[in-house]
Amino acid sequence: MAKKKKNKSKKTNKKEKVEYIKEESSFIGYYIIIAVIIFIIFGLIYGLRVLNPLYEDWALTKSDLMQHYSGWKAFRNESWHFPIGLLNSVSYPTYISIIYTDSIPLLAVFFKLIWFLLPKTFQYFGLYGLTCYILQGIFSAKILKKYTDSKINVIVGSLIFTLIPSMMFRMFYHTALASQWLILLSLETIYLYNDYKDSNKIY
């Protein structure tokens, strides 16, 4: 009896996973539409030139963005220190962390690892900004489609999430704080956990 119940549970869980994959696959086209619309909106707001890694003039403003970019430049041209992320060329002899320049530390460390492949002038803040916008739209769509079957409503709702003032104003002033898609990713993870937390149980 227990074995029969176990097999039935496995079949149910497998069916749920298959249905989830099918649902996500059917929505891929809409994710692409959302990404394209957001790309256009991003270009209208900030211009497409900021996406050029070789174009740095826009980052050399009086805003905090200059601090972010200067932190990356200093970190890139400095020797490695431990813990990873330390630099002292901007406050010698004191060491500070790249975290405090808000230079998107994960990207700063990654690009420093491949510094020899990069041109002399290189900025990643524009591309990161676009990535934040697109991920904001996609993760909000993934959450919204749990509450409505209307794909139009999902698309419109995701655009509203993307155009919230806190997102737009923070993007190139406190760029790290524009990573609001991480909040949506956290919510989506909670939803997935609640939906599939029993999928590996044997009873």
Model region roles, listed by residue range:
Residues 22-26, 30, 116-121, 125, ...:
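Juxtamembrane/transmembrane-helix boundary motifs in multi-pass membrane proteins
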Residues 33, 50, 89, 150-152, ...:
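Short hydrophobic/aromatic segments of transmembrane alpha-helices and their interfaces
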Residues 39-136, 164-179:
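Membrane-interface coil-to-helix junctions
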Residues 23-24, 28, 59-67, 202:
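Transmembrane signal-anchor hairpin modules in multi-pass inner-membrane enzymes, especially those
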Residues 1-51:
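Start-transfer (signal-anchor) and selected internal transmembrane alpha helices
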